Regions:
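N-terminal beta-strand motif that seeds the catalytic metal site of vicinal oxygen chelate
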Residues: 1-19, 69, 75, 122-125
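Vicinal oxygen chelate
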Residues: 3, 7, 32-33, 40-43, ...
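Residue-level preference for nonpolar/small residues embedded in alpha-helices
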Residues: 14-15, 79, 105
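Amphipathic alpha-helical segments
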Residues: 15-29, 87-91
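Short connector loops at helix/strand junctions that flank enzyme active sites
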Residues: 36, 49-51, 64-70
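Short, flexible, solvent-exposed loop/turn segments with mixed acidic/basic and small polar residues
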Residues: 58-63
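Mid-chain, well-packed structural core segment of small domains
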Residues: 64-85
């Protein structure tokens, strides 16, 4: 038997803001809020499905350097250019990680600067 990823915990300054952003990016819903201000989001069917939930945990610790982990998202219901425009309108911004301009993906940052990549459609909707 093996393990699978059930949730990703992301330390952040404003859990509600990031939860709202990522709910719109992934078409997730808020599944719960903890007393400490942490917000868990996930698929509409709730915890335990194929996709992991995301937990945005409040932190006042300063972040130093590049994070060793980032999220890749796949377009499911529109072309990559249309999705890029949608993500930018939601508050994402381009992130420069040394791209050449020939990549098939776009590197972006969420409202707190966490990098993520928008890939071309590779997964079915």
């Amino acid at each position: 038997m093996a393990c699978r990823i059930s949730e990703l915990v992301i330390d952040c300054r404003d859990p509600r803001r990031l939860a709202a952003f990522w709910c719109q990016v992934l078409d997730f819903v808020v599944l719960g809020t903890e007393d400490d201000g942490a917000v868990e989001i996930g698929p509409r069917e709730g915890f335990g499905g194929l996709q992991p939930t995301l937990v945005f945990s409040p932190s006042t610790e300063p972040r130093s350097g590049k994070l060793p982990l980032h999220i890749d998202v796949n377009v499911t219901d529109r072309d990559q250019d249309a999705e890029l425009e949608r993500l930018l309108a939601l508050g994402a911004r381009p992130a420069d990680v040394g791209q050449t301009g020939e990549e098939s993906w776009h590197c972006l940052a969420d409202p707190e600067g966490n990098e993520f990549c928008l890939l071309r459609a590779r997964l079915p909707a």
